[in-house]
Amino acid sequence: MKLKSIVLILAGILIAAYPLIKNTYAWHMQQTLLNEWEEEMKNRSQTENVNGDNMVVLTNTNNNNNNLSEEPSDDAVNSFLGLNELFSEIETDENENSSSSEPVKPTKQPIETIGLIKIEKIKANLPIMEGTTSSVLKVGVGKLIGTSDFGEVGNTALSAHRSHSYGQNFNRLNEIQEGDLITITTMDAVYNYEVYNILVVKPSDVSVLKKSKTESILTLITCHPLYTATDRLIVQAKLLPKE
């Protein structure tokens, strides 16, 4: 009888700790991606120093007003609409109480980091990956398929979950204000953006993906309000002009 009680207590502890284990695993995966990126950047920097090459800091040379008039691609629209199911899946996963004792499963496919996003205002420093699969959104930021490449004239869309853990992923994106800076770093360049537009839209409102004909726009997408996935919090920024 005593053994049975001990087993039940241990089982309860393990089940209660399950959400923490999942969050810790996601954090570990994120840190691994960041460390791998930093190591690759370090190796690349050493090679470039030998060859005389340097990373370029790119800014927008076009001072025209925004003209978000081109419709987004079908792939971009599908990626955006697909976030509804993904956010709901992740939210349900985080909201579930101790009912699940299923062990944490490692990512089935390797995830490759294509860049980093840094938002000093909210102390965010996150890996960016191609695509917006569940595996990607659980550990970092995904670039929507079909949106513009970084620095290109058009609209580059990035999405991340508003994790329940304070400061993790896009948890604090609601604190962003117009004029705040966002930096995107890739293997080849650094892109500096300034926030100019913040809004909340419905999950079906793909107008936020419209492409500028004159400027490089960055659009950040996350679920809103916190703990639900009923709407989308959108933060838009444009590539800064050269000083």
Language-model features and meaning:
Residues K2, L8-Q177, L181-A189, Y193-E243:
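Solvent-exposed, non-transmembrane regions of membrane-associated and secreted proteins
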